[in-house]
Amino acid sequence: MQVDTVRFGTLSVDDDKIMLFPKGLPGFEDERRFFLMDHAGNSKIKWLHSADSPELALVVADPFDLFEEYRPDVPDEIARELGITGPDGALVLTVLTVRAGQHEGEPPTISANLLAPIVISKERRTGAQVVLRSGEYGVRHQVHLRLGEGVKHTAGCGAGGMGSVGGVGSVGGVCSEETVATA
């Protein structure tokens, strides 16, 4: 299918790459169809782009690449709703917020929303943004990476314990959370 975007022009996206978010995302409840694309210049960063709204694109990353101790505990009922049957069946993303430097020449600051990861069933390609029940995480965890390069070093978030999706063990994948940069 052809998808018009403000930031990237017209893109050709295979139908099997479209992910369905039955309840949309917080703040974008009417947006249900999204796809992932790589960010040029940094393999750690991706774009979660709406298939229907040309201007809606969120900067996302794999939270496990950025925060080694991150262990989100996704409620069993949400895992069941999405069709996630095991840890290898989940893709987890964190939404990144990129803020311009305060002064000319100052690099941007980047934060990750670890409180509300985006969880996607790899098999069914259905997803949801999940607000975690524990108080361990917040919406602004500082990330140390450069937009044009790979991660320079990680920032720990002090999480303890093993995370799980549907009670099946720790989850790996791509991070998610707060809604950030729109195109």
Q: Predicted regions: what is each one?
A:
Residues 76-86:
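Short active-site loop/helix that positions an aromatic residue
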